[in-house]
Amino acid sequence: MPSLNDIRSTFLNYFAKQGHTIVPSSPLVPRNDPTLMFTNSGMVQFKNCFTGVDKRDYVRATTAQKCVRAGGKHNDLDNVGYTARHHTFFEMLGNFSFGDYFKSEAIPFAWELITRDFDIPKDRLYTTVYHTDDEAFEIWKKVGVPESRIIRIATSDNFWQMGPTGPCGPCTEIFYDHGDHIWGGPPGSPEEDGDRFIEIWNIVFMQNEKFEDGSMVDLDMQSIDTGMGLERIGALLQGSHDNYDTDLFKALIEASADATSVDPYGDQNVHHRVIADHLRSTSFLIADGVMPSNDGRGYVLRRIMRRAMRHAHLLGAKDPVMHRLVRTLVGQMGAAYPELGRAQALIEETLLLEETRFKQTLDRGLKLLDDELTALPEEAPLPGEAAFKLYDTYGFPLDLTQDALREKGRKVDTDGFDAAMAEQKAKARAAWAGSGESTDNAIWFDVLDVAGATDFLGYDTEKAEGQALALVVDGALSDRIAEGGSGWVVTNQTPFYGESGGQVGDTGVIRRLENRDHVALVEDSRKFADGKVYAHKVTMERGALAKGDAVELEVDHARRSAIRANHSATHLLHEALREALGDHVAQRGSLNAADRLRFDFSHAKALTEAELAQVGAEVNRFIRQNSRVETRIMTPDDARAIGAQALFGEKYGDEVRVVSMGRAETGKGADGKTWSIELCGGTHVAQTGDIGMFVLLGDSASSAGVRRIEALTGQAAFDHLSQEGARLSQVTAMLKAQPAEVAERVRALMDERKALQNEVAQLRRDLAMAGGAGQGGGAETHEVGGVPFLAQVLSGVSGKDLPALIDEHKSRMGSGAVLLIADAGGKAAVAAGVTEDLTARVSAVDLVKAAVAALGGKGGGGRPDMAQGGGQDAGKADAAIKAAEQVLGG
């Protein structure tokens, strides 16, 4: 019986023998295609090959493509675990032809592979063709399929198109008949939705182009796109009707069972299936650079994670489980997908962190859900407001709540949920609008109507003439900004860069050409009206400015130069991080200001000193290389074809600006290709050497799964190093040491200080035990309620020393109770102890709570033999002792 790994290899090797190039799977995050959430089919990485934009050195390709369907219209999440063939992650086997072979070869290839290499009985196979595709019908007859098993289908199921317009064509599909013991009919029959006949391969004949009027013409370059689900064909070849019975899933399910100590094939099987499937999608997404977050791809990942974690909870798991299963997954799939092994530590850390955090709210959220359902009539849907509270307060995605309700035979009021979500967004918008942080956006569309789109000249010049076409003062259009007044100036053209893409806006001056003494100081520049209007925030330093005035606009050159250096350094930093940490690194945000740069990126843990050093050295290496920074304008498709990185969620027009820099000599791209290629609208240096130098200040956590690096370039970096050098000189002078000796000298001083602190602490404890540190309450033992009781107020003793003193007093007393109060700058630390023979009569917790209350504090807790707490007023120590005595005497 072949394993899934064997089946994958057989498929790829068959097509390699037929002249196909084996192309590695593309990442689950589509390269430079912000229109697509996840890679969901084999043809995604070849989209531009089919349109002729991407010219490759092969015309035949075969792949095993990683795919995820868990968002948007391709969303299998709700059904995963409950059916035999739904998955969030799956592998799509495919063969492709880009203008090379067509139907007469594609169909025989498929038939030979499945009947000879896979040895599937021919009498179990049916095929479908589009109802007008006589050519495909005849080819199927020629390879030996009886006419009775070739079914013409007139629906869109057998006609594929890339979109409303563009490449399209008929499909042919291959179905397997599992036998009459399973209900269902062949495709095209009334019973086709049954499980007897299962599609195992789809072949698309990309032969037409469709236009807006619905008409179609034949393409000059006819192509082939096929897809066969590995899990589905694997189940068939392993003699099963259920994908979860294949060798890979069995291994993952058994690992889940071992981790939870729950039978993998009993009543709880569905939970193991969910965990096994979701482990695959979450692990591969993390390996490909997606990290859990509250929006976009990261939120889809978090939804999948939390659904799996809830099913682990239903299995009774008290501790995080998912991260313990990654090793098994890597063992099963790491050979085929090496990126999984490279990212294993990151995957495990991310899963552990996310599961630990979610478990803190999972129990409370499920209790709220149960309480809400208990209060409802039987079978009534959960109100949308309650589902929204679970989402907003406890982090329950709506589909997780729906999944939990499904098991109880209940539903959720999704309209009510949507209404609650819309209400919250409306409140957030209102709060934002009232914050004073932004001028009402509507005014800028009025400005656009008046002034038109601004022509940006800043890539080529920092000084230009223009005309003030619109002025905005106090949120309204105005004809004039008076001397000393402030407002916004919009000109027909400008060299000022408007804040966007992480780069701050330019500053500078605007002068009236008619009277150059009339000067407006530009404090900021921004883009409004969907980026079409560039507005300058000004204060009139001298004179006034009127609508229609001819003006000269001049950018602050020194500031712009510093910003350019930081922005270019950010591009180099991005690539250096990817090389040092892995391809999972993806930009999550940035700030390119004049004085510093900040870069947020996906990574689950702090960088080591060695990694930080490597990243800094790599950036400086490319700065010293002094290579030319190139910018080109091209279509988004052309940009993607050359490997330019784009940000998911960014909107791109018909043309994009591509910034390239650095020539790789070692490591990634060592063949001399460009090292960094990104879609970017910002301003950059002309040569990487213009950055000067790069100093990495440190790495910190920005949010869950996102790290932040801050750095300096140019003069700021030089000044920082000079200051650090001066500080080091001061330290070496104080220590009378050479710079290389400083670390060891400081370490010795710290060790000495710690030893002295321990000695002082021990002396204080000895003094306290001898009675010398006592004040007020004394240290004599006396009986209260028949219990030997010692109470003492201590000064110069820290609260953390009290438990050790309690234990020593108890040991000396043999039997009794102790109350110690440490005066710490007016506040009090309290500890109480009771010997084991008396804990049935009196609890140290009760003594502490009484004392803490008298000291103006709240709470206090611990064990019957030892408890601690704190109070606000150490001056009330006598009252605290009396309160404890009342507990003993009561």
From Swiss-Prot:
Recorded domain comment: Consists of three domains; the N-terminal catalytic domain, the editing domain and the C-terminal C-Ala domain. The editing domain removes incorrectly charged amino acids, while the C-Ala domain, along with tRNA(Ala), serves as a bridge to cooperatively bring together the editing and aminoacylation centers thus stimulating deacylation of misacylated tRNAs.
Keyword Lipoprotein: no
Note accompanying the cofactor annotation: Binds 1 zinc ion per subunit.
PROSITE patterns noted in UniProt: AA_TRNA_LIGASE_II_ALA
SUPFAM superfamilies per the UniProt record, alphabetical: Class II aaRS and biotin synthetases, Putative anticodon-binding domain of alanyl-tRNA synthetase (AlaRS), ThrRS/AlaRS common domain, Translation proteins
Residue pairs linked by disulfide bridges in the UniProt entry: none
Necessary cofactors: Zn(2+)
SMART domains, alphabetized: tRNA_SAD
EC number assigned by the record: 6.1.1.7
The protein's enzyme class: ligase
Substrates-to-products reaction catalysed: tRNA(Ala) + L-alanine + ATP = L-alanyl-tRNA(Ala) + AMP + diphosphate
Family from the record: Belongs to the class-II aminoacyl-tRNA synthetase family.
Function: Catalyzes the attachment of alanine to tRNA(Ala) in a two-step reaction: alanine is first activated by ATP to form Ala-AMP and then transferred to the acceptor end of tRNA(Ala). Also edits incorrectly charged Ser-tRNA(Ala) and Gly-tRNA(Ala) via its editing domain.
Protein name, as recorded: Alanine--tRNA ligase
Cellular localization per UniProt: Cytoplasm
CDD domains cross-referenced by the UniProt entry: AlaRS_core
BP terms from Gene Ontology: alanyl-tRNA aminoacylation; negative regulation of DNA-templated transcription
Alphabetical UniProt keywords: Aminoacyl-tRNA synthetase, ATP-binding, Cytoplasm, Ligase, Metal-binding, Nucleotide-binding, Protein biosynthesis, RNA-binding, tRNA-binding, Zinc
Domain of life: Bacteria
Gene Ontology terms for molecular function: alanine-tRNA ligase activity; aminoacyl-tRNA deacylase activity; ATP binding; tRNA binding; zinc ion binding
Gene this protein is translated from: alaS
Keyword Mitochondrion belongs to the record: no
